[in-house]
Amino acid sequence: MAASTMSIRSSAYSDSWQVDDCPESCCEPPCCATSCCAPAPCLTLVCTPVSRVSSPCCQVTCEPSPCQSGCTSSCTPSCCQQSSCQPAYCTSSPCQQACCVPVCCKPVCCVPVCCGASSCCQQSSYQPACCASSSCQPACCVPVCCKPVCCAPTCSEDSYSCCQQSSCQPACCTSSPCQQSYCVPVCCKPVCCKPICCVPVCSGASSLCCQQSGCQPACCTTSCCRPSSSVSLLCRPVCRPACCVPVSSCCAPTSSRQPSYCRQASCVSLLCRPVCSRPACYSFSSGQKSSC
């Protein structure tokens, strides 16, 4: 129906056609029930709730019209009740933003079972993309529940069990629907990104820490052995355990001003043997060569 209607106003002084400024009617069938519409002083039918407490007009969506204020202020729309909220529930529902308070339009998945507790990261039916695909706005849906399960390791950082194999993908944090500002990086360390070789279980010249693992070279910051040989199918360490001994512990100088006389291992040998069969040392007291 048009926003304004033509009406004839009889007058002893004028019988001309005039256009009045009556607002758009909401009494069309798709809008309000007929029982909630009442004739206005002008010839345009304006949707006016019969009762401001309970009226059929408040149960049906009203297009922008004067009756909208009566709907929103006098009753709770039915779209705000508990239901199996679909992701596009609010956008596809007959309720308009003015008629349906955004707090009522929060889908079920936007309200996590817990709030910030450790149990929030446990296995649940909560989908990772719930907040992203939800019709709730970010201010309406607190993304605490958006933290993936793998973002919370089951062990302490210095624990050896933390380095065991897990199902956590390396791109867990980056592929999470949570934004960087919502997901604390400390909690987003994938368990699988800290392989066994990153926590050596050996000391000194032991080669146990040099075993093969899924650890990327950039993952290990400290290791007692050098990277494995790229030409060996058995993937043995490039160096033997003797090469793994730090130079400082090979020959301890008697004076802090004198350098260590341990020679570097051969860089052309795949077995990485020392240049001499045993690291050469000099006795600072006698000045004679000896063996370590």
Swiss-Prot record:
Record's GO cellular component terms: cytosol; keratin filament
Database matches in Pfam families: Keratin_B2_2
Disulphide linkage map: none
Tissues in which the protein is found: Restricted to a narrow region of the hair fiber cuticle, lying approximately 20 cell layers above the apex of the dermal papilla of the hair root; not detected in any other tissues.
Sequence repeats mapped onto the chain: 26-30, 31-35, 36-40, 57-61, 79-83, 99-103, 104-108, 109-113, 114-118, 120-124, 130-134, 140-144, 145-149, 150-154, 162-166, 172-176, 182-186, 187-191, 192-196, 197-201, 209-213, 219-223, 224-228, 243-247, 250-254
Positions of region (25 X 5 AA repeats of C-C-X(3)): 26-254
Keyword annotations of the record: Keratin, Repeat
Subunit structure: Interacts with hair keratins.
Family the UniProt entry places it in: Belongs to the KRTAP type 10 family.
Role description: In the hair cortex, hair keratin intermediate filaments are embedded in an interfilamentous matrix, consisting of hair keratin-associated proteins (KRTAP), which are essential for the formation of a rigid and resistant hair shaft through their extensive disulfide bond cross-linking with abundant cysteine residues of hair keratins. The matrix proteins include the high-sulfur and high-glycine-tyrosine keratins.
Listed PANTHER family: KERATIN ASSOCIATED PROTEIN, KERATIN-ASSOCIATED PROTEIN 10-9
This protein's name: Keratin-associated protein 10-9
Gene: KRTAP10-9
